[in-house]
């Protein structure tokens, strides 16, 4: 299934508007769904995005997630790389199907499963399964041999305004000091 590009900007401030804007996307990727049969769940645990799940009727097996990017998150998250990785991991059998992109977010498959706890992570069949999954993830070929850590670190430092939080500058470091420290670390490592 090709990723659909939708020219819609989803409102993330108002949950009702979030749902009605999301419906415009669902009409394209789930044309067989009837608007009155769609159930919604707005997830509240995100810190950078707004996430809503949608499914038709009582059948949650085909749940679609609509993730609306928070304001300014593109400063710290490479959204194009995120989508490339989703597609790559899906092809390798790990990860959600990406259904659509829209002006300020993505729409993708919800993968059903069980949440792990500290207790379940100690079960041998569970931690072995997690280890296999992590090994598979870390064996994915990458497009470059150049590490991105230093670029990302500088990007994060750059997001901080030079005069951000005076308390941080007196108790910790200024942005210039952080940049100098990052350069020193890169030389040492």
Give the ranges of each region predicted by the language model:
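Short Pro/Gly-enriched beta-strand edge/turn motifs at strand-loop
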Residues: 31-38, 81, 89, 181-189
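ATP-binding pocket architecture of kinase catalytic cores
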Residues: 41-180
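Residues that form generic nucleotide/phosphate-binding pockets
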Residues: 25-29, 156-163, 181-188
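Amphipathic alpha-helical segments that form well-ordered structural scaffolds
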Residues: 21, 25, 85-88, 184
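Amphipathic repeat-derived elements
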Residues: 13-17, 74, 178-189
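Juxta-kinase regulatory segment immediately upstream of eukaryotic protein kinase catalytic domains
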Residues: 1-40
